Amino acid sequence: MPTIQQLVRKGRETLVEKGKSPALDACPQRRGVCVRVYTTTPKKPNSAMRKVARVRLTNGKEVNSYIPGEGHNLQEHSIVLVRGGRVKDLPGVRYHIVRGTLDTAGVNGRTQRRSKYGAKRPKPGQAAAAAKGKKK
């Protein structure tokens, strides 16, 4: 434990908090190019094939980004918008790709939480028909 005199001379060093999405450089989103699009398996209790893309951002950094929603159209040189937000059961995936922007298409047939997945609002007659088709 330091003496009062030592604290007067040196003071306490403040701890610097590490950010949750450092590759974005304090920006809300960043544009990037897909370097590799692949699937990976989650951590122990869960089981799935999660869709992930390795993205080179405009600031030169490369990050692993999760592709949300069912189905996607991303390939190797697709241009995408990346936002922060980790995937709890995928180690090393700390970013999400924004659906419905740049080269990323929105999720087809999505009726709820559409804004999160870049889906357009269905026309009044089509919503009922799509719901009936899903039930069968």
Curated annotation (Swiss-Prot):
Q: What SUPFAM superfamilies does the database record attribute to this sequence? A: Nucleic acid-binding proteins
- Comp. bias intervals (Low complexity): 124-136
For region Disordered, the annotated ranges are 104-136
What keywords are assigned to this protein?
A: Methylation, Ribonucleoprotein, Ribosomal protein, RNA-binding, rRNA-binding, tRNA-binding
| A Pfam entry, by short name | Ribosom_S12_S23
What are the annotated disulfide bridges?
none
Q: Name one GO cellular component term.
A: small ribosomal subunit
**Superkingdom:** Bacteria
**Which GO terms of type biological process are on file?**
translation
InterPro entries for this protein: NA-bd_OB-fold, Ribosomal_uS12, Ribosomal_uS12_bac
- Mind telling me which Gene3D superfamilies this protein's record contains? Nucleic acid-binding proteins (2.40.50.140)
Query: Molecular function terms in GO for this entry?
Result: rRNA binding; structural constituent of ribosome; tRNA binding
**What spans are recorded as compositionally biased (Basic residues)?**
111-123
Carrying 3-methylthioaspartic acid, the residues are 89
Question: Known PANTHER family for this protein?
Answer: 30S RIBOSOMAL PROTEIN S12 FAMILY MEMBER
Role according to the record: With S4 and S5 plays an important role in translational accuracy. Interacts with and stabilizes bases of the 16S rRNA that are involved in tRNA selection in the A site and with the mRNA backbone. Located at the interface of the 30S and 50S subunits, it traverses the body of the 30S subunit contacting proteins on the other side and probably holding the rRNA structure together. The combined cluster of proteins S8, S12 and S17 appears to hold together the shoulder and platform of the 30S subunit.
Q: Which family does it belong to?
A: Belongs to the universal ribosomal protein uS12 family.
Quaternary state and partners of this protein? Part of the 30S ribosomal subunit. Contacts proteins S8 and S17. May interact with IF1 in the 30S initiation complex.
Recorded protein name is: Small ribosomal subunit protein uS12
